[in-house]
Design a protein with these regions (language model features):
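C-terminal soluble interaction/assembly domains
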Residues: 74-76, 80-179
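Flexible, glycine-rich surface segments
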Residues: 23, 27-112
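Extracytoplasmic substrate-binding proteins
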Residues: 1-50, 75, 139-179
Length: 179
């Protein structure tokens, strides 16, 4: 809406916004009111300089996880912005999580082995052991540039990963499971 207004194409901007909102809500409805049997637990972030960076339970990302039928490991955290944690805190809260979401800029092919080389303790997480890492490489995907204007596509990616039976034919754009 804002960009349409800014560029003098308010009508087109409003129409585009309405179409995105409609599709997002249709996708969100797939997991609403207990329609999924299991809500997987997901955590996010990585260690950087000895600190684990994630976002709070009131963030856009936490809402996306909820709308995709997943429980974010910090869902009860009242913050909407960045959260700095130590490894032990994350491990205690996310050790048994089903999925781990990682967004980074990795040169080359990111893999479980490359992740383990960053910190061997990563291999102790269940999501690592059971190949539940959700990944976006910003070297190949304009995540922060495009994602804010395509939340319905991000939601579809997450739905496809968390509940593959709901969108079996979806082709991921931003997130896919790490191989």
């Amino acid at each position: 809406k804002f960009i349409g207004l800014l560029l003098g194409v308010e009508k087109e901007g409003n129409e585009r916004f309405a179409a995105i909102e409609k599709r997002y809500n249709e996708l969100k409805e797939l997991t609403a009111d207990g329609k999924v049997k299991k809500c997987p637990i997901v955590f996010s972030g990585e260690l950087r300089g000895g600190n684990w960076y994630a976002v709070g339970g009131k963030s856009f990302l936490a809402q996306l996880f909820k709308d995709a039928g997943a429980d974010y490991f910090l869902k009860d955290d009242e913050r909407s912005g960045g959260v700095t944690l130590d490894f032990e805190t994350v491990y205690n809260q996310a050790d048994d999580a089903d999925f781990w979401r990682i967004v980074n800029s990795f040169p080359g092919t990111f893999s479980y082995e490359a992740l383990k080389e960053q910190d061997p303790r990563y291999a102790d997480f269940r999501a690592f052991r059971e190949k539940g890492i959700i990944y976006c490489n910003m070297k190949n995907t304009p995540f922060y540039e495009s994602m804010p204007t395509e939340p319905e596509i991000v939601l579809a990616d997450l739905l496809h990963i968390f509940h593959p039976d709901l969108l079996p034919d979806h082709e991921p754009v931003y997130y896919s499971r790490l191989k």
